[in-house]
Amino acid sequence: MTAFNVVRFKVKPGSEKAFLDAHKNIGANWPGMRHANIISTGEGGYCIIVEWDSMEAIAAARPQMIETLNGFRHTLDDLGGGRGVTDPVSGPVAFSAK
C-alpha cells in the first residue's frame, strides 16, 4: 500500500543552498521510493514529502535517510520543544483524491 513520509526542517540563514543540494541524489538507490518534493514553508522552513511503495520500503530506507541527514545536519536549526532538528511523520495513504 502506498505510503508517505514527511519531515519538517528549519534551515539556518545562508544554508538553504547547501540544504537543497544535499538532496540532489536522494533516492537514486532507494528501492520503493517513487517521488520526492521539498517545499518551502517560509522563513527558513522546509518540508520534504516522499511517496513510497509501502511502509516497509520506508523502513528499509531509514539507514540511507539517516546517512543523508547526517550530511546536512549542520545546516539545520533546532525546532524547539524537544524535537531536535527534524519533525518526521509517516504512514500509509488513508484517502486519495485527484
Predicted regions and their residues:
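Residues in flexible loops and secondary-structure boundaries
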Residues: 17-19, 27, 41-47, 60, ...
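Glycine-rich beta-strand-turn "strand-cap" elements at beta-sheet edges
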Residues: 1-3, 10, 35-47, 71-98
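Conserved N-terminal glycine/acidic-rich loop preference
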Residues: 4-5, 19, 46-55
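An amphipathic, aromatic/His-enriched active-site/gating alpha helix that lines ligand/cofactor pockets
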Residues: 24-35, 51-87
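Short, surface-exposed ligand-recognition loops at beta-strand->loop->(often short) alpha-helix junctions
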Residues: 8-21
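A short, structured loop/turn motif at beta-sheet edges
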Residues: 12-14, 56, 98
